[in-house]
């Protein structure tokens, strides 16, 4: 886990934003904003980050939804594992005929898993919509169907972190009803993934945390990381 955060200082900030923000009629998310430095995303496409990070604690304000595309035993196993939706290739083709329906599908589900030998048949239908949303299906061979339950469970605890045009990462790391200690552990998991990508903690310039409708507050980083 990342050592960029000091436990006591981080907990103070998290408690302050949770206790200081007015209560809403819904369970607000806790969002993380990481500002990077020394990275030129325009000149070096490899500098972009696009990863799925498994969090130690699942945010409770919204269920992460997983859809599985495949056929036969693959879909049966997905149903048993509690996938939020299972789709056969023919269903994907039918949905793709209606652009509005395809966009609705893309927006409704956070992650997609596809049976490896099925994906080439459907990529032309879903690629133009899922690609820009960074939701292209995770490939899983039919012979690895026994791994589906663990993969679905892992994705339910995961968030995607990515840079777009600017060296800034926005992601969800919790919900307002979580313990401050759990949120700090989730933040550490995200920072660890960023550190592994760039192999240099000093690439992380500033870190902010906020509730959905609350102001952002900066998290102090450990001294001497440069």
Curated annotation (Swiss-Prot):
GO terms for cellular component: large ribosomal subunit. Keywords: Repressor, Ribonucleoprotein, Ribosomal protein, RNA-binding, rRNA-binding, Translation regulation, tRNA-binding. This is Large ribosomal subunit protein uL1. CDD domains: Ribosomal_L1. Binds directly to 23S rRNA. Probably involved in E site tRNA release. It comes from the Archaea. One of its GO terms (biological process) is regulation of translation. Gene3D superfamilies: 3.30.190.20, 3.40.50.790. Belongs to the universal ribosomal protein uL1 family. PANTHER family: 54S RIBOSOMAL PROTEIN L1, MITOCHONDRIAL, LARGE RIBOSOMAL SUBUNIT PROTEIN UL1M. One of its GO terms (molecular function) is tRNA binding. InterPro entries: Ribosomal_uL1, Ribosomal_uL1-like, Ribosomal_uL1/biogenesis, Ribosomal_uL1_3-a/b-sand, Ribosomal_uL1_arc. Part of the 50S ribosomal subunit. The gene is rpl1. The keyword RNA-binding applies.
